[in-house]
Swiss-Prot record:
Source superkingdom: Eukaryota
Low complexity composition-biased segments: 119-134, 161-172, 208-226
Encoding gene (name): EDC1
Subcellular localization: Cytoplasm
Region annotation (Disordered) ranges: 1-180, 193-264
The keyword ATP-binding appears for this protein: no
Organism expressing this protein natively: Candida albicans (strain SC5314 / ATCC MYA-2876) (Yeast)
Gene Ontology MF terms: RNA binding
Record-level GO cellular component terms: cytoplasm
Protein name, UniProt field: Enhancer of mRNA-decapping protein 1
Length: 264
């Protein structure tokens, strides 16, 4: 028997070659994709902490909590704080702190008095407590010690015979006028200023015998009238009036200067 001829296979048309629409993903696949995205974000934020060459974590100051171990409280202070302390508290080469105010006592201040009791006092008159008296004594002693330290550092001036100099030129032998008083009042200063012996510039009496060589008798009379002179310059003294005055020619006048141009 003759073999049966198979019909030719039809060629696919362009309409038949189009891909079929894919089925919609199931809800489980959607949840898996979301989980993968969240894992990527977590891996981005949970990356390894960047460290310095010394091993310390890098802190950029963005407020993000570092995953490193918490810092111990017993960690030594940073170098910046130590430098600030060194500059704020200078010291001498010997190690002692300088005292820029010698009059102020370096001893600790006395403790404040206790607050008054709330209970009513039975006695109307209260006797002074011994603490106040001791406090006044301590303050007085510190004041004297400060003055003694100042006197040791700044010795007082003395004359070759051992006496203290008298800058006010007073004949009084009291100790008040021997040296400048420490706590002098305004009235005392005024008295010393008004005293003619205390003035720095004294009136100098001119000798009339030195003016006998003057040419005019009128000048001699002027010198006798101005017997006292307190100036410090010769040009302001009465003797400057005795100098010969220059004479100027009033007839001819000033010489006429010749100009370079000629009048034609």
């Amino acid at each position: 028997m003759l073999a049966q001829q198979q019909p030719p296979t039809p060629t696919p048309t362009p309409q038949q070659s189009q891909p079929q629409p894919q089925p919609q993903p199931q809800p489980q696949q959607m949840s898996q994709s979301r989980k993968s995205k969240s894992k990527k974000k977590q891996s981005y934020y949970d990356e390894e902490v960047r460290t310095l060459p010394s091993g310390a974590p890098v802190d950029f100051g963005h407020g993000k909590k570092s995953t490193s171990k918490p810092k111990s409280k017993s960690k030594p202070a940073s170098s910046s704080t130590t430098n600030f302390k060194l500059t704020a508290s200078p010291s001498l080469p010997s190690g002692a702190k300088p005292n820029f105010q010698p009059y102020k006592s370096t001893s600790p201040s006395p403790p404040p008095p206790p607050p008054p009791s709330t209970q009513p006092s039975t006695s109307t008159s209260t006797s002074p407590t011994p603490r106040t008296s001791t406090g006044n004594k301590n303050h007085h002693n510190r004041h004297q010690s400060n003055h003694s330290d100042y006197d040791n550092d700044h010795p007082q001036l003395s004359l070759p015979n051992g006496k203290k100099p008298n800058f006010f030129n007073n004949n009084n032998n009291d100790k008040k006028f021997s040296t400048i008083p420490f706590d002098s009042s305004i009235n005392l200063i005024r008295k010393q200023y008004n005293n003619p012996n205390t003035k720095a510039i004294k009136e100098k009496k001119l000798d009339n015998n030195n003016n006998n060589n003057s040419s005019n008798n009128s000048n001699n009379s002027n010198n006798s009238n101005s017997a006292y002179y307190a100036g410090s310059s010769f040009h302001s003294s009465p003797d400057a009036l005795n100098l010969p005055k220059p004479s100027f020619k009033s007839n001819n006048g000033s010489p006429r200067q010749s100009s370079g141009l000629r009048d034609y």
